[in-house]
Amino acid sequence: MKKQIAVLCTVLLWVCAVFAPMAQAAGPALSATEAYCIIDADTGLVLAQQNMDEELHPASITKVMTLGLACEKAQGQWDGVSLEVTHEDVYSLAGTDSSHIALQEGEHVPLTDALYATMMASANDGANLLSEYFGDGTIAGGVAAMNAQVAELGLKHTHFANPHGISDTDHYTSCYDMAQILRWALTQPGFETLFTRNEMYPMKPTDIQPKERYFHQQDKMRVGSSRYYIPAIQGSKIGYTNIARYSYVCLAEQNGVRLICVTMQSNIKTDKYNDVRTLLDYAFAHYTNYTDIPAQGLTRELTVAGGGAPLGMVTVTDPGTRLLLADGLTAGDVSVTLELPEQYVLGTSPAVYAVYTVNGQDKQESASVRVPATITGLEELLERNTGVQLGSGTRSPGKTAGLLIGISLGCTVLAAGVTVVVMKLRKAKKPKHKH
């Protein structure tokens, strides 16, 4: 009898497994490429993915972070900046058989040339040189800055061991993380111009090398005469090592929709070309319009503290947003919650967000995106406690923090008889993105 019951249970489990509704993948299933991720370039919302959190060797798409940090340091002031090539820039690459532009120790290279050499020629010696520029003068310092930026972005599946992407057991990223790294880099002055250049770039002679060097676009998907040409791709970085195989990250735009697409560990080069085309064709066919998500009227109270004392309460609400939803989905398929700290301390960037979550069903990846929430009453609270006129109205945390970060942390309540006498304005930190 027990045996019969066991057999019956087994049959029932099998029947349930066969006829239970299966979760259908929101995007194409790729067999020749291990992992991919497609996000909306504007909000960072994940649209489709396969193994997007798998930690893989990135190869030269590493240089997106290197170039982003160099652009951040330069703040658009490229002209007149000269970098001196060190012994380590050149000889740390000995025996790697990696891409380079034959920089020589002691050579002085304009920053602009180093940027385009690293971007277009995928020069590992150029990446080393740039890492010293935004680090503390050493490659190790540059790598530390890269990992600090990873932490700042809240990414969980990335660690860099070098600025160029030569395979190392401690050097890895994921498709999701790399998509968010590119999204961040695109906000840095000059990066998008660098990333999207198609024309040949001439590097003039230097104080050591008398001949010009020329850098060409290496991505066949951006060459009009190539059979692999994809007009929607605006900018890209390609990567390859024997261990990483083929990796790719691009910015693509069509009919006002901007996407970031990352593929990693494609078996052969033609697999990469074909799979990127498949992914972009899918995305642009299914995502054609942005949808306004109205404010839902969520309200919560948040304690504000300064000078070690509570100052009062402010009101936090969801602001509404605009999301790229798959055709067939509506604002009704999006839910929102508020994400607040225990208290907001003056002098810090307020980590106050509305989290919008898409129920993608079988049409879109179910994913979330964080948007700065709206804070009401902060200026009035400060006026009551400090006597400082900051204006009135409702501000998002990004704008409010820009007014407040410079306020002295020695601010106390009126009962203490102390008022703030110094106020400076500076920009708030960018919010972290997570899926």
Task: Describe each region flagged by the PLM.
Residues 15-16, 76, 206:
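Residues in and immediately flanking transmembrane alpha helices
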Residues 23-176, 180-189:
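Active-site-adjacent loops and short helices of periplasmic peptidoglycan-processing enzymes
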Residues 3-24, 404-423:
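Sec-dependent N-terminal signal peptides of Gram-positive bacterial secreted proteins and lipoproteins
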